[in-house]
Amino acid sequence: MKVLAAGSLRTVWTSLMAPFPEPVEAEFGPAGLLRERIEAGEFCDLFASANLAHPRALLAAGRALAVFPFASNQLCLTVRREVWRKGDDWFSLLTRETLRIATSTPGADPSGDYAQELFTRMGAAGESVRRRAQALVGGRDSAPIPPGRLAAEWILHSGKAEVFIGYASYGETLRQMEGLKVITIPPPYNPLANYACAVITPQAQPLADFLLSVEAQKIVQQAGFLPSPRE
């Protein structure tokens, strides 16, 4: 069985598939680019996306049999510790014009789309942040993230930016890394990232059922993801 999955699922995938009885071959990448590959005719049995829009588009185009949400996520800031000042919060860091802000690429990667939604929710201040933010990962022509590295850690430690906007599911791992600080973004500013799967072939139905099982949901949530809001 072949799965194309959002890159943010890579860290949980091995433990998630351990109880599943069938062999699964998974390839990870920005969900928007994976959707384009499926639309262009690439084969897979199941597509796991970091948003609902891409699976729904495949369903509407007749390329998927069913769509179901299975997890959710939020955003957080990761910053180089030396730029953090006592009293700083997410808003003060994003609006400090001397700091370079990095995101993933909107359109190609839902993480970048959620960052754009964050800027919109910030109102007028967010428009200035939007103009300053640079999409440094997750695009067609982005530099590849080195194997075994997280985007936030790689971008910040390589000196490309001082602030990275990414998924909160990485937060616990990033907090353990030297020189980095993770900052929470509160509601109502923080968008909810709804993860969903598109069942492409009937052979994927057992995997779809498994992903919604109590056992699988426990593994996903232990990895820093949130439950999916049921529609």
Q: Predicted regions: what is each one?
A:
Residues 62-68:
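Central helical "cap/lid" subdomain
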Residues 1-19, 25-27, 32-42, 49-52, ...:
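Exported/periplasmic ABC-transporter solute-binding proteins
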